[in-house]
Amino acid sequence: MRANADNPEDAELSRGFGAEGIGLCRTEHMFLGDRKQIIQTFILNEDPAVREKAVGELLAAQTGDFLGMFRAMDGLPVIVRLLDPPLHEFLESPRALDVEIAKLEAAGGDKALIAEKRMLMEQIDGMSEANPMLGLRGCRLGIVYPILPVMQVRAIATACAELQKEGLNPKPEIMIPLVSVVAELEKLRKVAEDTIAEVAAEQGVELDIPVGTMIELPRAAVTADEIGAVADFFSFGTNDLTQTTFGFSRDDVEAEFVPQYLAERLLPYNPFATIDPGVAKLVEMGVELGHKGNPDLVCGVCGEHGGDPDSVKTFHTIGLDYVSCSPYRVPLARLAAGQAALAEKMGDGRDK
């Protein structure tokens, strides 16, 4: 039983609830607040020197974040997902900028500032995508902007090395998101391994940091034997796997027609709350194929289904090694996992 946590406070809370590790640490949440301006500078400037300076600032900040996370979970695994969302999520809304420009113009504001805001709006508009959740995000970001995964892996490895020198036992694992073809994982795994080796040499320590991937696209599930051969672990991202299997946009369908589908019994339940049998088949296929590629592959789930008792029982039947959910759902998920294991044991006893 693991938990989803993005900061040391949630990690400590999870540990108190009995979590045996962190199944998902979302690094994009570490880029918000005061750091949002830094990532915006990286995105909006093509000058290599400016980008390099921004990445240096992010490296220092992320190293501090990981020091806190790994210290809080000393001796337990912490799966860190590299940057996943589309970059536009870190930028200002073009609509909000348009309103701001209109207000400045109405008030007779500074023309240079208005021109600057208008140029920024045009730049952000130029980065927009028709379907950003299936566009430039996940591992694709790391391939298009290789400096980003290098920075994040260096921060993870540096934090790990520093804590090892303190006599602690940090256990980070690196997760590469949204892989659809094995070549993506091969490319980014090499980036990670090369960076880890550099940090280990600089720090004079040995670093053993597993590298795995999220299985959240149908193609990844049905080619999991290929992907598993170059992964240390799989984590099934069942939120996105449900979206891409159904062809649903969760943000839209839950408000627009899922209630009607439930009322008319076109769906037996909300598939984003409890795992759908069709999606579960993809998970099962991914586990079976993944183990063909790598018999030692560790498989878990980090979507919201990890905290749903009915889904937990399904995952136990499939043979997953762990589930991960929000800290406050850990006790309920632990109970469901225990009940599933007991039911299986009693069933085995009756069979004998």
Which residues does each predicted region cover?
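Conserved alpha/beta-domain cores
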Residues: 1-352
